[in-house]
From Swiss-Prot:
Entry EC no(s): 2.8.2.2
Family that this chain belongs to: Belongs to the sulfotransferase 1 family.
Protein known as: 3-beta-hydroxysteroid sulfotransferase
Organism classification: Eukaryota, Metazoa, Chordata, Craniata, Vertebrata
One Gene Ontology biological process: steroid metabolic process
Length: 287
């Protein structure tokens, strides 16, 4: 990969919107407050769907907020220059987002009562989604083929580093009462029950009809049509022609892309990297 990206503490980041100074400041000086709600994911794991759901839970299903304020302003990415600047004027209780690996996350979180919702997704689907995303965004070197991107992904040589390390490290927090682990697959399979679980975790009591509205306005159909959530407002200098942020929103798309040899190569490394974890932690292993 070419050096149109930056390295910080062994992790690759885009050059646009990031800096080593800011990443260091976020880790060492960003103050996490007890009342904060933080959505954390590895990229392409359902981040924006999760943000939309949380925003709609907080508004009790009223779509005005999600239809009038861009998603990156409603729940800013704290490690980006834009998001970090926005955080200075965020009113309590705050919600914000991060893709940061655990070792680069704000140190103040670990002594706080802030609530983190961590969403994981089948890394095979993450890989395919990341391939299409990287191919259409001007933030990193474009892979020539899926095979090339798979090589980068398995080496952890992609934006935000290794999926395996990211998930392993964050899952070490899973027994904490202020930490909720969800999966993209569970969200697809039974959205209502997962929304109810998030409500319970956040201490929000919604009426059934309010949950109906959360489900309606966070659906793939509504998000794809909502310019505040579909990233159509991104500046043209960041995207290439044909860019679509919300591409499919399905489970198992990797099966239409991997060859048998690629699937076997991925499985071998996956089994090595994720050995020792109970399979029930990963719903895709039961599919």
């Amino acid at each position: 990969m070419s050096d149109n990206t930056l390295w910080f503490e062994g992790i690759r980041f885009p050059m646009v919107g990031f800096s080593p100074e800011l990443l260091r400041e976020v880790r060492d000086k960003f103050l996490v407050k007890d009342e904060d709600t933080i959505t954390v994911t590895y990229p392409k794991s359902g981040t924006n769907w999760l943000i939309e759901i949380v925003c709609l839970i907080l508004s009790k299903g009223d779509p005005k907020w999600v239809q009038s304020v861009p998603i990156w302003d409603r729940s800013p990415w704290i490690e980006t220059q834009h998001g970090n600047e926005l955080m200075k004027s965020q009113k309590d209780p705050r919600i914000y987002t991060s893709h940061l690996p655990l070792h680069l996350f704000p140190k103040s979180f670990f002594s706080s009562k802030a609530k983190v919702i961590y969403c994981i997704r089948n890394p095979r689907d993450v890989l395919v989604s990341g391939y299409y995303f990287t191919s259409k965004m001007k933030i990193a070197e474009k892979p020539e083929t899926l095979q090339q991107y798979m090589k980068w992904f398995l080496q952890g040589n992609v934006i935000y580093g290794s999926w395996f390390e990211h998930v392993r490290d964050w899952l070490s927090m899973r027994e904490k009462e202020n930490f909720l682990v969800l999966s993209y697959e569970e969200l697809i399979k039974d959205t209502r029950s997962i929304v109810e679980k998030i409500c319970q975790f956040l201490g929000k009591r919604l009426k059934p009809e309010e949950i109906d509205l959360v489900l309606k306005y966070s659906s793939f159909k509504f998000m794809k049509e909502n310019e505040m959530s579909n990233y159509s407002l991104l500046p043209n200098d960041l995207t290439t022609e044909g860019f679509t942020f919300l591409r499919k929103g399905v489970v198992g798309d990797w099966k239409h892309h991997f060859t048998v040899a690629q699937a076997e190569e991925f499985d071998k490394i996956y089994q090595e990297k994720m050995a020792g974890y109970p399979p029930k932690l990963f719903p895709w292993e039961e599919c």
